[in-house]
Amino acid sequence: MKIVVSVENAAAINEVAEYNPTFIEIRLDRMEGDLQDQVRAIREKTDIPLIATLRSRDEGGRFVGDADLWARIVGPIARYVDIVDVEARYRDHAPFIKSQGVQILASLHTNEMPTVPELGRIDEMLRSYGDIPKIVVRPKTREDLFELVLFTHQAQKPICTSIMGAEFRYARAILPLFGSEFTFSHAGAPTAEGQYHIREMRQLADLLK
């Protein structure tokens, strides 16, 4: 199971690195000050692969700018990371970001539960500009969650699927068993509702092997 730990400041890196996650996600939208300097400092502190994310408010983050501002912020930072999360709304800038030598995690977060055909269309759209699609939805029922698990199992790989909210938080540990590329956790302050601490996620991963 590939575990990603989300952080929102450079000071947390030493503590996070002790848990040896597969990736560290830098939540740019939750950081203050000079972002480029902070990301550079994180890069100098660790060899763990980095994901840069500037999450929009509409998809659960704090960034409220337009696509051009998003690109002006993320563009100079891309050189210091390995993967950049690019929401569908910013996809026109994906070729420029990819030209920096990084992979694109093409993402869409919704508070709805799409049907399986809709999930397939979202997957296809995200693959049109990214290397790894990331689809995060909000199941309303167990049947919804079953459909998400089935979709994940049958989808082209790689793919990352997850859920929004705390009601079905256990899906964060289950979906990787059915083919989801990553699961996201925290090491102190959750960056999304329902996230497990990496200690808990490792325990779950070990128990579910």
Swiss-Prot record:
A single GO molecular-function term is:
3-dehydroquinate dehydratase activity
Q: Which gene specifies this protein's sequence? A: aroD
The UniProt family comment states:
Belongs to the type-I 3-dehydroquinase family.
Origin species: Methanoculleus marisnigri (strain ATCC 35101 / DSM 1498 / JR1)
Q: Does the keyword Lipid metabolism apply?
A: no
Listed Pfam families: DHquinase_I
Tell me the domain of life.
Answer: Archaea
- For the protein in the UniProt heading, the enzyme class is lyase
Q: Which CDD domains match?
A: DHQase_I (cd00502)
Q: Name one GO biological process term.
A: amino acid biosynthetic process
The reaction(s) catalysed by this protein are: 3-dehydroquinate = 3-dehydroshikimate + H2O
Matching HAMAP family, A to Z?
A: AroD
Query: What EC identifiers does the entry list?
Result: 4.2.1.10
Keyword entries, A-Z: Amino-acid biosynthesis, Aromatic amino acid biosynthesis, Lyase, Schiff base
**What pathway is this protein said to act in by its record?**
Metabolic intermediate biosynthesis; chorismate biosynthesis; chorismate from D-erythrose 4-phosphate and phosphoenolpyruvate: step 3/7
What is the annotated quaternary arrangement, including any partners? Homodimer.
Q: What is this protein called?
A: 3-dehydroquinate dehydratase
Amino-acid biosynthesis as a keyword of this entry, yes or no, is yes
Annotated positions binding 3-dehydroquinate: S6, E25, I26, R27, R55, R172, T191, Q195
Task: List, from the UniProt record, the residues annotated as the active site of this protein.
Answer: H109 (proton donor/acceptor), K134 (schiff-base intermediate with substrate)
Its function, per the record, reads:
Involved in the third step of the chorismate pathway, which leads to the biosynthesis of aromatic amino acids. Catalyzes the cis-dehydration of 3-dehydroquinate (DHQ) and introduces the first double bond of the aromatic ring to yield 3-dehydroshikimate.
